[in-house]
Amino acid sequence: MSFRDKLDVYMRLARMDRPIGTLLLLWPCLMALTFAAGGLPDLKVFIIFVIGVVVMRACGCIINDYADRDLDSHVERTKARPLASGEISSKEALLLFGVMGLFAFSLVLMLNPLVVQLSVVGIILTIIYPFTKRYTNMPQMFLGTVWSWSIPMAYAAQTGTVPIEAWWLFAANWCWTVAYDTMYAMVDRDDDLKVGIKSTAILFGRYDRQIIAAFQLAALSCFIIAGMLAGRGEIYGLGILAFIGFAVYQQKLIYGRERGPCFTAFLNNNWAGMVLYIALTLDYLIL
């Protein structure tokens, strides 16, 4: 295999060709930095967190594929992944995970000790998550914690503390993550049942749409509370209204529980997060 072919395999293993996960991680992280800074965050901190999100999302994908390497070949959506298809060895994948993990850790070493301490917890959570699908019916709830961990880290980096406002934002993102990752799990539900993978899509059963709606409502409530604690105004409120519109659209998409529309609903959350982040930023800059 040529160097170019090997690089392509590494890029696909790290999902660099599919940025949706990176974006879903990025928006709440940037919102946390903006809230914490009371406007535009420190440029150095901003750059470190953007790079860190990209690298840690890649790490998460690698360790996820390593954990699922014997199962992915039985799932339609994942059977072509590099580890499942045999394009890359388990040792190579773990080596790449280690290198990227060390690089991510080197980034936080440029920040304060509290961020470093929180980052260690974040790495541990990232490693544990893929294995929760074997032992619990609620891996999406664990993922909510993993994908929200950048929020207290962002506050710690910007202010040196993690105030109550940060935990409301954490709760908002946790609920939102459970909602959209359950939509994602609905795509694989039939295959997951065959191979023994657990998910909230399976756990919720015929009440999946209603429970997703409840998590969306909880996320919105927490986003509103975080905004109120930060003294946000009308533009942020418009972002909240847009977020509601996206949630309603997603509910319409998942109504029939078909794979294609459920996946489209999952992808639509990128736009919901982006619009809310832009609204928050404009609210600080204009008002």
Swiss-Prot record:
UniProt-listed PANTHER family: 4-HYDROXYBENZOATE POLYPRENYLTRANSFERASE, MITOCHONDRIAL, PRENYLTRANSFERASES
Catalytic reaction list: all-trans-octaprenyl diphosphate + 4-hydroxybenzoate = 4-hydroxy-3-(all-trans-octaprenyl)benzoate + diphosphate
Cofactors named for this entry: Mg(2+)
Descriptive protein name: 4-hydroxybenzoate octaprenyltransferase
Highest taxon of source: Bacteria
GO cellular component terms, semicolon-separated: plasma membrane
Compartments it resides in: Cell inner membrane
Keyword Cell membrane: yes
Enzyme class label: transferase
HAMAP family documented for this protein: UbiA (MF_01635)
Source organism per UniProt: Shewanella halifaxensis (strain HAW-EB4)
